[in-house]
Curated annotation (Swiss-Prot):
Residues 40-212 form the EngB-type G domain. Belongs to the TRAFAC class TrmE-Era-EngA-EngB-Septin-like GTPase superfamily. EngB GTPase family. PANTHER family: ENGB-TYPE G DOMAIN-CONTAINING PROTEIN, MSS1/TRME-RELATED GTP-BINDING PROTEIN. The lineage of its organism: Bacteria, Pseudomonadati, Pseudomonadota, Alphaproteobacteria, Rickettsiales. GO terms for biological process: division septum assembly. The gene is engB. Mg(2+) binds at residues 55, 77. Coiled coil: none annotated. This is Probable GTP-binding protein EngB. SUPFAM superfamilies: P-loop containing nucleoside triphosphate hydrolases.
Length: 214
């Protein structure tokens, strides 16, 4: 289902507004697989290419401009960061993949860390695959989606920086073809941290995960 920022009409709208009214706080960072914590709470993950806007989206939905560090320099997030919302939900910010200007050894370390987490987390409920609306779906994004499906991880596509794109027909078509190739169906949400488009829809999709806590 492709959502272009239209308001949701369901009983859960109040649930997400109550949840995200509370202040999220940074609780842990992991540079190595041995440092990954187990909070025994549902975890929602944000993953995407370097400089796709992960930190900005996290700050927007958590109503905290300084929660996750924002930078125009690709590769700013260099560890897995965990944010706790009133012991109900853990927001997870993964290092960006792709063109970060870091040594190859560091990129390889990130890849191991990201892959291990996505494969082994017992609390992972939903992955938000962030894609820059201006760039479209790239090969790295496809590989991540294939990894998620191989490990039976539920994900949805978040087109970031939606305020930068006016004609979405090609993006919608690209997303539909991409999902058809994977034989997978999921939400496709356009989100802008600047205009706040799609933030209600995104928050609602995250809040739903609490009721399915294992």
């Amino acid at each position: 289902m492709i959502n272009n920022g239209k308001a949701l009409n369901n009983k859960k709208s109040s649930d997400y507004s109550k949840l995200f009214r509370h202040q999220a706080k940074f609780v842990a960072g992991a540079n190595h697989i041995n440092q990954i914590p187990d909070f025994s709470l549902p975890e929602i993950v944000f993953v995407g290419k370097s400089n796709v806007g992960k930190s900005s989206i996290i700050n927007t939905i958590c109503n905290n401009k300084s929660l996750a560090k924002v930078s125009n320099i690709p590769g700013r997030t260099r560890q897995i960061n965990f944010f706790n919302i009133i012991d109900k939900l853990i927001i997870v910010d993964l290092p960006g993949y792709g063109f970060a200007n870091v040594p190859i050894s560091v990129k390889e370390q990130w890849e191991v860390l990201i892959t291990y987490y996505l494969r082994n987390s017992h609390n992972l409920m939903l992955v938000n695959l962030l894609i820059d609306s201006r760039r479209g779906i790239k090969e790295n994004d496809k590989k991540v989606a294939e990894l998620l499906l191989a490990n039976k991880r539920e994900f949805q596509i978040i087109f970031t920086k939606s305020d930068k794109v006016t004609d979405r027909k090609n993006l919608n078509y690209e997303a539909q073809n991409f999902l058809a190739t994977l034989h997978y169906s999921c939400n496709v949400i356009y989100v802008s941290s600047r205009s706040k488009e799609g933030t209600k829809e995104l928050k609602a999709s995250l809040a739903k995960c609490i009721k399915y806590q294992r």
